């Protein structure tokens, strides 16, 4: 359920790559808060630091400075071992490229992550919700790109996570399939109450968000609440 309860809290987050003359400051003190149950879209051109931001809040990279808290747990203070366990148990990830196991069926690809949770979602209910029940025994190469992305979303969702992080989830899809995936993510947010952060270069997607962040040269240029988000079915680009 959406509300005013802070769920993802980022404070003064910094990251650079390289040293000396090769040093590149990718993020320069990002501070923002995303409330529980919100859909947050982060926009910005290529090279603005969007994917790095997502990797840092998901614990896939280490920050140079600042803090990240999810559901009251400060991830940046955890040991590598504890962070890895928290990430596998509590966070869901959806990437542009699906990285599905080619020799596993659609159902088996989702089951791989189900055991990481003490409270996984019922498999049949999830597969039916994703529109994958009829394809559950097929291999990824036997289904469309949109169905593969649905499987990737299911793999993230089956753990029943509080936070799902999506890096260009429609970047490799055509317009029609992109709309279908966004409608699915909207339904996932509504039915399961998870907080979703979507990183994208497609500004039209921001219209479905409760909160819109815009990165420019590693800095947070905009942090706005969208008072009137539209349904994903109404998006056009």
Language-model features, listed with the residues they occupy:
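Conserved beta-strand-loop-alpha-helix hinge in the C-terminal portion
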Residues: 219-237
